């Protein structure tokens, strides 16, 4: 995907991208490639792949979830090089955005990126979700929590739901369909205060499969969750489901 295809494809999906926003995306791409020469931030190095697999892919929640186009608070868990949080912020600058990552080298990149793009109302946090979800400045404070991760769904539920206020949503961005994981999530959802809302299956323009799953926060998460760092990954609530 090249920049023209990026704009045309999104415009055809009723998500117009202004010239000013395209300048920000181009700056982002160039800075990511330059920074990656000294710090490995992404396995995706080709510009055409970054436009598709990072930028376009990050914006897919805006195509399927109308509430994501409004003013809202959003936390991106395990943001890495800024995906999906920074592309979402570029397009919807009404977001109050928090980017959380456990590696300082990624936070250093994100701090410089935010400054370079002159993005407002963006906070970076160096740490683990298991720790910061117990911090009252972050716990149940967000309208949305999002993750583009390969972790088991039950693990992600435990990491994300504690950040979201009752009435908010978490958004899981998956590369394959996860019926068995959702089917096996009932115990985790009950413990954590969530309820499956919607699931969208679609393909990127290159035919790669994607799934968006939204979970409504219907009650406060029990105080003991999330458990200590590493435990949600090793021993998900309700077990692992293939």
UniProtKB/Swiss-Prot annotation:
Keyword rRNA-binding found? no
What gene is behind this protein?
rsmG
For the keyword Transferase, the answer is yes
Q: Name one GO cellular component term.
A: cytosol
Report residues binding S-adenosyl-L-methionine: 78, 83, 129-130, 148
Write the record's keywords in alphabetical order, separated by commas: Cytoplasm, Methyltransferase, rRNA processing, S-adenosyl-L-methionine, Transferase
The record's listing under InterPro entries reads: rRNA_ssu_MeTfrase_G, SAM-dependent_MTases_sf
Q: Which PANTHER family match?
A: S-ADENOSYL-L-METHIONINE-DEPENDENT METHYLTRANSFERASES SUPERFAMILY PROTEIN
Under which name does UniProt file this protein? Answer: Ribosomal RNA small subunit methyltransferase G
Q: Name one Pfam family in it.
A: GidB
Which EC number(s) does UniProt give? 2.1.1.-
Q: Which Gene3D superfamilies match?
A: Vaccinia Virus protein VP39
Q: List the disulfide bonds.
A: none
What biological function has been recorded for the protein in this entry? Specifically methylates the N7 position of a guanine in 16S rRNA.
Chain segments carrying region Disordered: 221-242
Localisation per UniProt entry:
Cytoplasm
**One GO molecular function term?**
rRNA (guanine-N7-)-methyltransferase activity
Question: What family does the database annotate?
Answer: Belongs to the methyltransferase superfamily. RNA methyltransferase RsmG family.
């Amino acid at each position: 995907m090249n920049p023209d295809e990026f704009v045309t494809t999104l415009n055809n999906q009723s998500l117009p991208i202004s010239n000013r926003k395209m300048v920000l995306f181009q700056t982002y791409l160039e800075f990511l490639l330059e920074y990656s020469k000294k710090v490995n931030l992404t396995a995706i190095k080709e510009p055409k792949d970054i436009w598709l697999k990072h930028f376009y892919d990050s914006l897919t929640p805006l195509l399927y979830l109308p509430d994501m186009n409004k003013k809202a608070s959003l936390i991106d868990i395990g943001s890495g090089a800024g995906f999906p949080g920074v592309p979402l912020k570029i397009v919807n600058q009404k977001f109050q955005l928090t980017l959380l990552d456990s590696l300082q080298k990624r936070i250093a990149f994100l701090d410089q990126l935010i400054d370079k793009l002159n993005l407002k109302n963006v906070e970076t946090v160096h740490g683990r979700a298991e720790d910061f979800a117990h911090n009252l400045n972050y716990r149940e404070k967000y309208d949305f929590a999002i993750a583009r991760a390969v972790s088991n769904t039950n693990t992600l539920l435990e990491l994300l739901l504690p950040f979201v206020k009752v009435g908010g949503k978490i958004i899981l961005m998956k590369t394959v369909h996860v019926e068995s994981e959702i089917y096996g999530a009932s115990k985790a959802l009950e413990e954590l205060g969530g309820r499956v809302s919607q699931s969208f299956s679609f393909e990127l323009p290159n035919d790669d499969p994607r799934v968006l799953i939204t979970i409504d926060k219907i009650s406060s998460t029990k105080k003991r969750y999330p458990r200590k760092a590493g435990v949600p990954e090793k021993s998900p609530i309700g077990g692992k489901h293939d």
